Amino acid sequence: MAELQKLSSRLKSVKVTRKITKAMELVAASKIRRAKESFFSNKEYFQIIQDIFDNLASKTEQIFLKKQMKFDKENNTNSILYIVINSDLGLCGAYNSSIAKEIKKEIKSKDKLFLIGKKGLLFLGKFKTQITNLDKVKEISTNYKNIKKISEKILSMFKSGDYKSIKIVYTKYVNAFTYLPTIKHALPILKSEKNINEATFSNLEFEPDPITIFQKAIPLYFSSLLYSCVLESHVSEVSSRRIAMENATKNADELGDQLKIELNTIRQSKITQEITEIVAGSETEI
């Protein structure tokens, strides 16, 4: 009897859990469409900015590319600042752990981390001494104004001369089932290795000159790049959560079916035993 009650209780818990995972799956599915719309529309915009900066870099002397910002002090460090984009919520499969694995492969003791997303503290806790914003980790936001404020703070840190370069660690969206943890170089801007389509910029004039524009427009470039990475990571996160919840729902269904079989087996066994006892009792009376 005790085993029967235990199985019934487990089956009830599985059914409740299944309702939760199914609801979360549907919520994630509804968020994916909006997240994709934001990401792909911004992707077209950022690609234009990227092409313009690639063109600017191709027309700018290499010596300037190394000194494209006015630093507060001479930059002689080899330290790299990694901006790590995680999620605020869990239950999204290997989304956060994959980012953590990627950063652990590359980070050195002299490097620093700037976290965006509360879950970063959980998965990168062993690097506490290297996290620059340990007590002020920002929640992930798909609002450009919020990302712009973060980018301004990071640019200020870069201009202090404490870092040789800045890299962004985010999740690249490939398709609905594939997301790749990626480390992208952000600053200083390097001369593009890809072939510039001169025809696209043949009628483009720079006023006053490429170097001045390059210098003034770096904040726009960096905030746009960071925003693009945040949006792409967000699409990957909600897609990963939908799949995780879909798998959890399937597992709940399978476990529920298994428990039902066990429950029915015990019930049948109990009924058979009772019938046997009744028959045996009747035969004894006869």
Curated annotation (Swiss-Prot):
Keywords: ATP synthesis, Cell membrane, CF(1), Hydrogen ion transport, Ion transport, Membrane, Transport. The keyword Membrane applies. It is a peripheral membrane protein. Gene3D superfamilies: 3.40.1380.10, ATP synthase, gamma subunit, helix hairpin domain. It comes from the Bacteria. NCBIfam families: ATPsyn_F1gamma (TIGR01146). F-type ATPases have 2 components, CF(1) - the catalytic core - and CF(0) - the membrane proton channel. CF(1) has five subunits: alpha(3), beta(3), gamma(1), delta(1), epsilon(1). CF(0) has three main subunits: a, b and c. This is ATP synthase gamma chain. It comes from Mycoplasma mobile (strain ATCC 43663 / 163K / NCTC 11711). The gene is atpG.
